[in-house]
C-alpha cells in the first residue's frame, strides 16, 4: 500500500467518525430506509389494487400486534407513538413505523385530535410544548401515587380504629380477685388459732390494707367479706377454747369438794 492509499484510508476513517459523532450518518441511514419503505409501499399498493394480493410490507408485525392495532386502545397507542415521533422530528422513523403497523399515512392525527378533545388536552405546538404521550404517562403515575397514598392512609386509619375498638371491648385488668386477696392460711386448727396465727393474721391484715388503695370496688367488697368471715371464725374458736378451759376448771373444783 503506497502513501496515497494510506492517506485516503485515514481520511475516510476520520470523516466517517466525524459524521457518526455528529449523527449525520444515522440520519442518512434513516432517510435511506424510509425511502426504501416508501418505494415498497407504493409497489404494494399497486399489487393490492390490481391483483388483490396481500401486501408484502404492510402489517409485517406479529399477530398479537395486529389484533392490538385493530382495537380502539391499540389505535390510540399507535397514534401516541406517532405523535411523539412527529414531536421529536423523527420523520424517517415515522415513515417506517406507519407501514409496519399497517396504519394509513397521517391517520394518527385524527386519533390524537379526538383524544385531545375528549380529555381536554391542548394541541397547540410551540417551543415549550410536550409530547402528549408524556402527559398521559405523568397523569397515570400521579394517579397511581395518589391511590397508594390514599390506600396507605385508609389502611392506617382502619388499623387504628380496629385497635381502639379492641381496647374498648377488652379494657386492661389491673388485677384479679385472687391476685389482690392477701395470702391467708387455707386451714387453721383450733389450737393454732389462739397462738401464732394472731400475729400472722395482723401482719397479713396490714399488708392487705396497704394494697386496697389500688383495688377495684368489687374486689374490696369481697375482701371485706372474707375478712369478716375469718374474724367470725376466730371469735368462735376463741370462745370454744375459753369454754373448754372454764369447764375443766369447774370439774376440778367439784372433784375437790
Curated annotation (Swiss-Prot):
Ranges of Low complexity composition bias in the record: 187-199
Look up keyword 4Fe-4S and say if it applies.
no
Residue numbers spanned by region Disordered: 148-216, 231-257
Q: Which GO terms describe its cellular component?
A: cortical microtubule cytoskeleton; cytoplasm
Deletion consequences: Extreme defects in morphogenesis, positioning of mitotic planes and cellular organization due to dysfunction of the cortical cytoskeleton and absence of the preprophase band of microtubules. In the ton1 insertional mutant, the two highly similar genes in tandem, TON1A and TON1B are simultaneously disrupted.
Where's it found, cell-wise?
A: Cytoplasm; Cytoplasm, Cytoskeleton
Q: What is its main location?
A: cytoplasm
User: One GO BP annotation here?
Assistant: cortical cytoskeleton organization
UniProt xrefs under Gene3D superfamilies:
1.20.960.40
- Where on the tree of life does the source sit, at the highest rank? Eukaryota
Q: Name the InterPro entries for this protein.
A: LisH
Per UniProt, the ranges with Basic and acidic residues bias are: 201-212, 244-257
Where in this chain does the record put each LisH domain?
Answer: 73-105
Q: What does this protein do?
A: Involved in the control of the dynamic organization of the cortical cytoskeleton. May play a role in the organization of microtubule arrays at the centrosome through interaction with centrin 1 (CEN1).
* Subunit field text: Interacts with CEN1, LNG1/TRM2 and LNG2/TRM1 (via C-terminus).
What's this protein's name?
Protein TONNEAU 1b
Could you tell me which species this protein originates from? Answer: Arabidopsis thaliana
